[in-house]
């Protein structure tokens, strides 16, 4: 069983490769790369629970765990609906140091683009604000190898951790937390994992 969720039908047949795939698909990690603990979040940019996590709980985790050097945090794509894969592609196509900012913008403006009558036009608007012109945006969302790479990240989460919904979190490649749970649940799991 795969996680395609119909995403394969959205992949263009023979789009140009204007994106550096090695850079675009490399892991997106914040925090000390040598931190003793690791948390990976499988998220969809069209998921309202993911947006809520990032607006609330993530800020506290970042302050208490990431910024203190105890945790490295990895963003892993798991697009759930059609336009989400384009949003993930857009985020991965910006420079690596702008990725987290683009994720913030896409999650904070989620209601504007994810539920729009024409979500691709709304994503193009966000791209323009970020300095990405229409032609470049079209190249990004039609880049089949980039889109396939994003699907492979999600598929690996499904195959390895049975990830089927977002947000889902893997702590130290051992424990899985599913859903937008509060900070206290993360605190308990992180404290347990750190001992």
Language-model regions: role of each:
Residues 1-17:
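N-terminal export signals
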Residues 18-22, 193-195:
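Proteins that catalyze or organize thiol-disulfide redox chemistry
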Residues 20-37:
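A short beta-strand-turn-helix
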Residues 33, 66-68, 162-164:
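Extracellular/periplasmic catalytic domains that process cell-envelope and extracellular macromolecules
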Residues 34-51:
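Short active-site neighborhood of thiol/selenol oxidoreductases, capturing the structured segment around
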Residues 38-41, 72-75, 168-170:
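Soluble periplasmic/extracytoplasmic beta-strand elements of cell-envelope proteins
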């Amino acid at each position: 069983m795969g996680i395609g969720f119909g995403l394969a039908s959205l992949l263009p047949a023979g789009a140009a490769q204007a994106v550096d795939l090695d850079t675009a698909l490399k892991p997106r990690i914040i925090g000390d790369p040598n931190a003793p603990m690791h948390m990976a979040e499988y998220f969809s940019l069209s998921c309202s629970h993911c947006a809520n996590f990032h607006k609330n709980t993530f800020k506290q985790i970042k302050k208490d765990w990431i910024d203190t050097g105890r945790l490295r945090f990895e963003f892993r794509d798991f697009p759930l609906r059609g336009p989400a894969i384009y949003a993930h592609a857009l985020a991965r196509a910006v420079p690596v140091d702008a990725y987290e900012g683009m994720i913030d913008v896409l999650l904070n403006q989620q209601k504007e683009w994810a539920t729009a009558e024409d979500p691709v036009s709304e994503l193009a608007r966000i791209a323009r604000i970020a300095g990405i012109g229409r032609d470049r945006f079209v190249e990004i969302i039609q880049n089949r190898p980039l889109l396939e790479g994003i699907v492979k990240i999600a598929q690996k989460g499904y195959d390895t951790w049975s990830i089927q919904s977002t947000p889902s979190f893997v702590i130290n490649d051992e424990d899985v937390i599913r859903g937008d749970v509060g900070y206290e649940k993360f605190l308990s799991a992180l404290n347990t994992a750190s001992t």
